[in-house]
């Protein structure tokens, strides 16, 4: 009998990927995280290219999780709490489409859950402005450079620029 859990992926963009990755790494049931790029047209983009805002990519975190231990709905709940989804193409001082709020879905079930979650958040009364989060089908995930992986953890914690 195979005891290996069936793992799933979720991909989120919520500003600087250092902060996003650190938040999801704390979640019980998340077995791995990877900082990277998604949503653009350039293959194998570098950090410098993504920051130039000419690749179309967002900084994202790929979350590998065990759905028997943490649900996709719980990951969505966390996503909404770790950034301001009403800021268009920015988070705090980080400005540009590469810092956009985005949920990349991997399955039709994830798409449905993401849309329902966004509708619920939008009607929650938590925000004075409309939610501008993009929901899109996952495309190729490009790993960020090694120095970006678990960046804050390697430096003893901290936060991004804000």
From Swiss-Prot:
GO terms for biological process: cellular response to oxidative stress; protein modification process. The keyword Oxidoreductase applies. GO terms for cellular component: cytoplasm. Keywords: Oxidoreductase. It catalyses: L-methionyl-[protein] + [thioredoxin]-disulfide + H2O = L-methionyl-(S)-S-oxide-[protein] + [thioredoxin]-dithiol; [thioredoxin]-disulfide + L-methionine + H2O = L-methionine (S)-S-oxide + [thioredoxin]-dithiol. The active site is at 16. The keyword Oxidoreductase applies. One of its GO terms (molecular function) is L-methionine-(S)-S-oxide reductase activity. It holds the Pfam family PMSR. Its EC number is 1.8.4.11. Belongs to the MsrA Met sulfoxide reductase family. Has an important function as a repair enzyme for proteins that have been inactivated by oxidation. Catalyzes the reversible oxidation-reduction of methionine sulfoxide in proteins to methionine. NCBIfam families: msrA. This is Peptide methionine sulfoxide reductase MsrA. It comes from Geobacter metallireducens (strain ATCC 53774 / DSM 7210 / GS-15). The gene is msrA.
